[in-house]
A protein has these predicted regions:
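Adenine nucleotide-associated cytosolic modules
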Residues: 1-300
């Protein structure tokens, strides 16, 4: 148990309520990261907490001003990773409406403040599509994302989600950046219900080529190359040593163990980080494999 995190949920809920109250008092406007707005949110949080104590309802011993500050400062920001997470939650709740599963009957707060960079960073807006992301993580992180070279194996359901995420967050979208995608399969009618980048008119077309074209439409700055070759021992002439050596990390979005273990073996050999993930019905798994720090996929 993380004793330092006790009452963290209550602190988050109180901070969220303070932001909502701020909006109510300021014409539906979210607070900015100005000292004036943050101080106002902290004052509101303390008032709400005092009211909770008086009514013997939800309250905390002492309001955590830092939690309120962070919640207020980033309340205006919207980034693709958070949108995807909450989109998944909403989708699951819609499935639960059938009565087969138990719905969420309480507030759900997703706390990822620990992902914020330590120390001062340049968060000045650039007037670009990535401003919200820059406001949270800083310009240096955004520049690194833009220069990344990555290789994604598979352009099905997971692959479609990753292509969208890469395009929206600017991964491989800067000078020198590159996203390479391969899938030797073509789009079928049965794919359309879960591989959301594809439409009826795409049936029969290459998954990787189509996904990359649509990713480019989402963000014209996306530097993307599509391949149609299977990643296997007989295609080492396509995915050769210089190809693997040039990568910063690899993404598995395949649907079989054989392909996963082969890509895992390549990543072990060339010492490349691997993002492994998969889905099964309403369930999913993900695994980040870091050379010399974690087990490889085949060993886990």
């Amino acid at each position: 148990m993380k004793f330092m995190g006790m009452q963290r949920s209550e602190q988050l809920h109180l901070a969220f309520r303070a932001v909502l109250k701020f909006r109510e008092l300021n014409g539906s406007q979210f607070p900015s990261d100005s000292a004036e707005h943050i101080d106002e949110c902290i004052r509101i949080a303390n008032t709400l907490n005092d009211e909770g104590k008086a009514a013997e309802q939800l309250n905390v011993e002492q309001v955590d001003a830092e939690v309120v500050r962070l919640t207020a400062a980033y309340s205006r920001c919207s980034i693709t990773s958070m949108a995807a997470f909450f989109g998944g939650i909403v989708a699951q709740e819609i499935v639960k409406f059938t009565g087969k599963y138990s719905p969420i009957k309480q507030m759900l707060h997703y706390d990822v403040f620990e992902s914020l960079p330590e120390g001062p960073v340049n968060r000045a807006p650039r007037g670009c599509r990535y401003d919200d992301q820059i406001r949270i993580y800083g310009q240096e992180v955004q520049d690194k994302l833009g220069k990344i070279h990555t290789f994604m194996v598979g352009a099905g359901a997971l692959g479609c989600e990753y292509i969208k995420a890469f395009a929206m967050m600017g991964l491989g979208c800067g000078e020198g950046g590159l996203v390479q995608v391969t899938d030797n399969d073509n789009i079928e009618v049965s794919n359309l219900n879960r591989q959301f980048l594809f439409r009826k008119n795409n049936v029969g077309s290459s998954k990787s080529l189509t996904a990359c074209q649509i990713g480019k439409q989402m963000n014209p700055g996306l530097n993307v190359v599509a391949h149609t070759s299977l990643v296997a021992p007989n295609t080492v002439n396509v995915f050769n040593d210089p190809f693997w050596e040039d990568l910063d990390f690899v993404v598995n979005a395949v649907d079989n163990i054989k392909a996963r273990t082969y890509v895992d073996g390549r990543c072990v050999w060339f010492e490349k980080p691997l993002l492994e993930s998969g889905t099964l019905g309403t369930k999913a798994n993900s695994q980040m494999i870091i050379p010399h720090k974690t087990q490889c996929y085949s060993d886990s």
